Amino acid sequence: MIRIGHGFDVHKFGGEGPVIIGGVAIPYEQGLIAHSDGDVALHALTDALLGAIAAGDIGRHFPDTDDKWKGANSRELLKDVYRRVKEQGYRLGNADVTIMAQAPKMAPHIDAMCAAIAEDLETDISNINVKATTTERLGFTGRKEGIATEAVVLLFKQ
């Protein structure tokens, strides 16, 4: 059996940098406001995995009303969810992540993001794609108010 999952996340800028995205700390004058570390890429990816196994969303498993998750490392959340994916008998086929941000520039960090995600999902880096785009200065991302990310995953039954 093959399953697909889709995830989406948004965080607004605020406070001190760096911005953590795809498991990588990117120098920037502001950080992202969040209960956890605010890693929009990993949050979208985590939601995609949860969606693929019909297990709800990240907020259900790691609620922002629970102080246990305050400042949580999103790489640990992703690994926890991938453990659940494997427990249900699935393995990752591939993951594709799109980051929508006017700033900071993502291109210099994409390879490191792919490597971190591949490590966390126990897969070859060739199964992970991360790309970034601006919104041509349109909308909240274009005004540099925040960052949005979408992710899709393909899972195969083992």
Swiss-Prot record:
Alphabetical GO biological process terms: isopentenyl diphosphate biosynthetic process, methylerythritol 4-phosphate pathway; terpenoid biosynthetic process
Superkingdom of the source species: Bacteria
E.C. number(s) listed in UniProt: 4.6.1.12
Annotated positions binding a divalent metal cation: D9, H11, H43
Cofactor note: Binds 1 divalent metal cation per subunit.
Pfam families found in the cross-reference section: YgbB
Pathway(s) per entry: Isoprenoid biosynthesis; isopentenyl diphosphate biosynthesis via DXP pathway; isopentenyl diphosphate from 1-deoxy-D-xylulose 5-phosphate: step 4/6
Known function: Involved in the biosynthesis of isopentenyl diphosphate (IPP) and dimethylallyl diphosphate (DMAPP), two major building blocks of isoprenoid compounds. Catalyzes the conversion of 4-diphosphocytidyl-2-C-methyl-D-erythritol 2-phosphate (CDP-ME2P) to 2-C-methyl-D-erythritol 2,4-cyclodiphosphate (ME-CPP) with a corresponding release of cytidine 5-monophosphate (CMP).
Subunit structure: Homotrimer.
Annotated protein name in UniProt: 2-C-methyl-D-erythritol 2,4-cyclodiphosphate synthase
Native species: Vibrio parahaemolyticus serotype O3:K6 (strain RIMD 2210633)
